């Protein structure tokens, strides 16, 4: 099933010829459709979703069992073939689906909840389809990221989605330190049994007073949004939390150059070094962030290093 006007859909390319060989000249006529699914309340399903499920030649689902429950709730039966498409089989399944698309099939991709590709399977298939010259379109739907941002009460004019943090404590701290000075609002997904440890780590890196919102079970019966400082929220989460979690964290405060002394410059360089940056790059990044010459940051780091050596020498170490 082709979309009206699909034969004129432009796909620009920098290679000679201007347009990659594709459906415009009859080479590729298939279409990949990314469809959003409810994050909780099935009534939030996009109206077009049922039509796409009924009309697609192939439905690729993150979990075919959850897809079955969704189609039953929507009162629709997929007319095409249903296949699984999840993290464990993405590599093998992607070429198969691209071949179907190249042959003219309309392939619908859905995940368990929300939009495909957003911390869910999808982007590999999109990239492969684009490379092959396949038309890619979407049926926009619910998003836990945008819903949590809207409910958080924090600035949402600029934000950064960080997905899930690493499970290991050390790796989690490293990842958080990488964005310790990020001024945009941060959004994370987290499992309920790790929430208290994650919030405690955030409080350690960002500060206990940094504002945040924990959004739980969005659009479901027991939806809850808990707002407060990271320290307060970490203590609350220690009592046990259930459900699907999205955490929204306020960005770092905007500190003017006059507030950043030598000690703070050195601290920021160390944070970046601990996150894996080389000293030269860390110094350049801090200088650009604060708005001071790189030489000023370099001198502060050298002075701190020399002071530490003198202190160790005087202590007889």
Predicted regions and their residues:
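A contiguous loop/helix-start segment that scaffolds small-molecule binding in enzyme catalytic cores
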Residues: 3, 7-14, 18, 22-25, ...
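Short active-site oxyanion
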Residues: 53-59, 133-137, 185-186
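Glycine-rich, flexible N-terminal cofactor/catalytic loop recognition
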Residues: 2-87
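Short glycine-cluster motifs
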Residues: 102-166
